[in-house]
Swiss-Prot record:
HIG1 domain: residues covered: 1-86
Name of the gene: rcf1-A
Family: Belongs to the RCF1 family.
Coiled-coil ranges from the UniProt annotation: 75-107
Name recorded for this polypeptide: Respiratory supercomplex factor 1-A, mitochondrial
BP GO annotations: mitochondrial respirasome assembly
Length: 167
């Protein structure tokens, strides 16, 4: 199945088209050659040869156009199959892109759920901590809170030593 969906590079496509319709590049080359010869004749001031080469250019372009039309009619079914093949390749690419997008969305969804769970757990823990801290402070006097917030300075340490000796 993978071999059905292999894509061709531009060089492979050019070679395939050259093998399918070799008359078109031949007609283009003949047209270019006729134009080159007409240019050279114009530089040489040979108007008869120049007119002859312009007519040859017209014939070469007619040959190229005829090759394009005949090749189009001859390869009509093959081109239709190739379009269907290219359509399948595009559908496969679109499906792969869609699947990758869905996988990315699922990964982000899992990440978001994990983050929400962690955030909820942290919130519950923080709420319990604040409730526990409020319960401990209910039985304490307001002056003790102030002492705790100030911290222990030198004077506080001396007072604690003096009070400790009295007890």
């Amino acid at each position: 199945m993978c071999s059905d969906f292999e894509e061709e590079t531009s060089i492979q496509k050019f070679k395939r088209r050259l093998k399918e319709e070799p008359l078109i590049p031949l007609g283009c080359a003949a047209t270019c050659y006729a134009l080159y010869r007409a240019y050279r004749s114009g530089k040489a001031k040979d108007s008869v040869e120049m007119n002859r080469m312009f007519r040859a250019r017209i014939y070469a372009q007619f040959f190229t156009l005829l090759a394009v039309v005949a090749g189009g009619m001859y390869y009509k079914t093959e081109r239709k199959q190739r379009r269907e093949f290219e359509k399948k390749v595009e559908e496969r690419k679109a499906q792969e892109k869609r699947d990758a997008w869905l996988r990315e969305l699922e990964a982000r969804d899992k990440e978001d759920k994990g983050w929400k769970e962690r955030h909820a757990a942290v919130s519950v823990t923080a709420k319990k901590e604040t409730e526990g801290a409020v319960d401990k402070n209910v039985n304490q006097a307001p002056t003790e809170e102030v002492v705790e917030k100030r911290g222990t300075g030198i004077l506080d340490a001396v007072k604690a030593l003096v009070q400790g000796k009295k007890d």
